[in-house]
Structure formats: C-alpha cells, structure tokens
Amino acid sequence: MSLRLTNTLTRRTEPFTPLKDGHVSIYCCGVTVYDLCHLGHARSYIAWDVLRRYLIWRGYTVTFVQNFTDIDDKILKRAAEKECSMQEISEQNIEAFHQDMDSLGILRPDRMPRATQCLDGIRSLIGELEASGAAYSVDGDVYFAVMKHHGYGKLSGRDLNEQQQNADGRVADAEEARKQHSFDFALWKGAKSGEPSFPSPWGAGRPGWHIECSAMVREELGETIDIHLGGADLIFPHHENEIAQSEAATGKQLARYWLHNGMVNVGGQKMSKSLGNFTTIRALLENGVSPMTLRLFILQAHYRKPLDFTADAINAAATGWKGLNAALGLGNIYSETLNWPECKPLPQGVIQAAHPSNQEQCNKIRQHFIDALDDDLNSSGAIAVLFDLARPLRALANRLKRGDTKAIQETAKLNLLPRWQLLVELANVLGLEAEKAAQPAPERNNRVDENHIQRAIATRKEAKAARDFAKADLIRDELRAQGIELIDKPGGLTDWISS
C-alpha cells in the first residue's frame, strides 16, 4: 500500500502522487505573530512535522515552506497596548515561536517568508487580478470579486447564492456598502491614520491576510504545489480565498492535496485566544510537562480528529512516555554493560532513510509501522507499534536499573540490539527521542496545597460568573506562576495539573 491522504478538496482519501517524481512541495500556513503559541498550534505543527519526517524517511526530497503573518490588525492592537512598534511585537514573537517549536523537536521549515518581505509579489498579484477583472478598487481599497470566480466554495462546500439569501436584510456597515457582493474580501486595505502603511498603485496601505499566502506560495514554490496544510478553522474563509485568488490569476490549480488538522478542545470548545481558554506551549513546558510527553499526547489522536485537552490525558501521556523513554535510552545508558555500539543522536533536522534489517521480525514490525502511517498518517497506530517494539526493551531497562546481572546474559540470547535500533529509527520518524533525566522540579511545586488551589478555582469561578474576566485571568496567571495549570471542563468544572 502507498501513502494515502484525506484531501479536503475532494473529500476522499486518495493515493499520494507528487507532481515531480521523488520531490514534494509543501506550504503550511504559519502564525500571526502577536502572541505566544498555544497547544492548538503545537497540535498542527507536530502533525505536519510527522508528515514531513515520514516523507523524508520514505526517500522523498521535501521542500517545506511556512510563512509568518507579520502585519495584521491583531499585531497592531498588541503594539498599541504595549506602546511599541509592530516590528518589535513581530520580532519578539517570531523568536518565541522558534524557541517553542525547537523545544518540541519540530524541524524548522526550509524557508519562512514574512508578509512584509513579499510586498512586491503581493502587489504584482493584486495587479494581475485587477487587470483580469477578478478584482476592483474602491477609494484605495482593492477587493476580490467573488462572483467572478465560478469555482468559489469548492473547498468548503459553501453555496454563495444560498448564503446570500440567508444574509438578506442585514444592515450593511460602511465597508459592506462599498463592496459589489457581501462575500468580496480585501486584497489591499487603504492606509488608516496612525497605522503602518506601504506604497502601492492604489495608494498607501497594507495587504489583506489571504493574498499574503497566495503570493508567498507562488514566490517560494510556484503556481501549483503538491500539498497545502493548515488547521480546519482555516478552510473557510482563508483557504477558500487563497484558492480563488491564485487560480483566478494563474488559471492553474493551487494545490493538489489540502490537509487540515482537527482542533484542540477544552471543555467542549475549541482552544483559542479569542475565547481565553488557551494554554501556551511555554506554560506547559515550564510547569513540568516534557516536550516528548506533549508530542505523544498529540500523536495518540488522529490528526483530523478533535483532541480533548484534559489533565487525565496529559498524565496518561506522561506515563506512556516514561516507559517509551526508558526503552529508547537503553542503548545509550547501558551500551558498555550490554556491549552494544553507542547510538549517537542524529544531528538536528536529519532524518535517515528507511533501511531494512537483517532480522525478519524487525522487518515485519517496520512494515506494520509503514502500513499505519500510509493510512492517512495514522499516528496512533504507529505509536502502538512503538509500544509493542519497546516492551521487552523497557523490561530490560528496568532490570538493569535494579542491578539484575542475569538480565545481561538473557539479553545476549534474545539479540535485542536490532530491536532497539529499529525502535530508535521509527521513533525518530515521529519526532520522539530519548530525553535526559529530568531535572528536579522547583521546590515550590514539591508540595501542592490542594485546598489553596480549590479555593482559587472557586474564586475564579465567581469572578467569571460576575463577568470580571480580568480577575479570573489574574487568578489563572497567579496559579500558573506557582506551577499549576488550570483546564476548564464542561459544566463549569475546572481541572488542574501540576509539575
């Protein structure tokens, strides 16, 4: 069986065939850099990191491009709040993004263009759309004429005529009144007083969000790419609009495969900054959740399915990782005792191509692993293979840790070295690598005062009921500083985890 991927565009799980044999071009929508990344971002970028690692492992040459949106209303708002420039906010959060992704073992993209660095390509693309009649300008703004693009809605399945009927009777604001159609969207926004702006044929202003990605895809990878990635929340309007812009300009298909990951849910709601129910990657790591525990937690669910963030789920992942980590570290810690050659870690960003073992059993296990990931990146199935592979290795590690000398003689008969080498190889495809012994947790977290936490949770609940969200956020931040992370659940309940 070859790799099969669920294509949002066709709504089918299809065999993957790249445009150019042996080469794969991938574009992934990046973050708007106004704040720290939360667990939802980790879910997305870990899923796509595994896709990239797997393709490389299977022998493909992969070009992976991921953008930064470094000019946006949210960035401007945050800059005003902090009384600093848009550039300062962007630079701070780009650096924080790299730190978070590096901590999680996510390979850095081959190229990471920024919107402000691609303005020539953006202006050129808008000009082409206007010249073809697919866009129109109004007093310094430029809009895409949705009704001129007959394929609009093919990704999301939305019927514009039906939605227009449902929208009839709405009171239009000033911008809506300027549009030819309510679903038309901005390609270029005229300058506003006090905001950064850039020159253009339509006057000073800045690009719309959607046009940025279309321009960067074309500039970095060409007019048609193999795979376009993003979260399910981007299907409409962002990715729908990307398709409309790009295909109206080039007359060619933008991407052959569209993959979308499911959301992280907290208390039955999508984790998001707008809802205030998010937990940053940094907070989780600082509070003692290991990077590999987070990877395992995320990969135990299929990338397209919703992922529920609960204390129980994190604790279960931590337990699972403890055993897997013991097996992965076996050959490094006990290489001399077992007379095994030391397994040196691969350089950052290096993925070895798959290589068959001289053991038939190992080759069967490798094939089970391949079968799982070939099935639309079934990471939970691949992890199950790792746990089966690790079982005797974990048992050996535990015996050696207890000083059981008989284990060495028995191991020689079992010939576990190829099994361990295979475990390290396959785990690397999922970005799972043995961690060094964890440092002791800060003293503040050694004793958890549960009564104090419950009182704080009760006070926070009262504050939220009174719509005093500032106080509720303050309580959450104070507990976070003490190493306690709150997790809101359905029914107004709140769980917590501690490092």
Curated annotation (Swiss-Prot):
Enzyme Commission number: 6.1.1.16
Requisite cofactors: Zn(2+)
Motif ('HIGH' region): 31-41
InterPro entries named among the record's database cross-references: Cys-tRNA-ligase, Cys-tRNA-synt_Ia_DALR, Cys-tRNA/MSH_ligase, Rossmann-like_a/b/a_fold, tRNA-synt_1_cat_dom, tRNAsynth_Ia_anticodon-bd
Residues bound to Zn(2+): C29, C213, H238, E242
Matching Gene3D superfamilies: Cysteine-tRNA ligase, C-terminal anti-codon recognition domain (1.20.120.1910), HUPs (3.40.50.620)
Pfam families noted in UniProt: DALR_2 (PF09190), tRNA-synt_1e (PF01406)
Localization per Swiss-Prot or TrEMBL: Cytoplasm
Catalytic activity field: tRNA(Cys) + L-cysteine + ATP = L-cysteinyl-tRNA(Cys) + AMP + diphosphate
Gene Ontology cellular-component terms listed: cytosol
Residue positions binding ATP: K273
Annotated signal sequence range: none
Single GO molecular function: zinc ion binding
Cofactor: how and how many bound: Binds 1 zinc ion per subunit.
Enzyme's top EC category: ligase
Homology family: Belongs to the class-I aminoacyl-tRNA synthetase family.
Protein name: Cysteine--tRNA ligase
Species whose genome carries this gene: Prochlorococcus marinus (strain MIT 9313)
Name of the gene: cysS
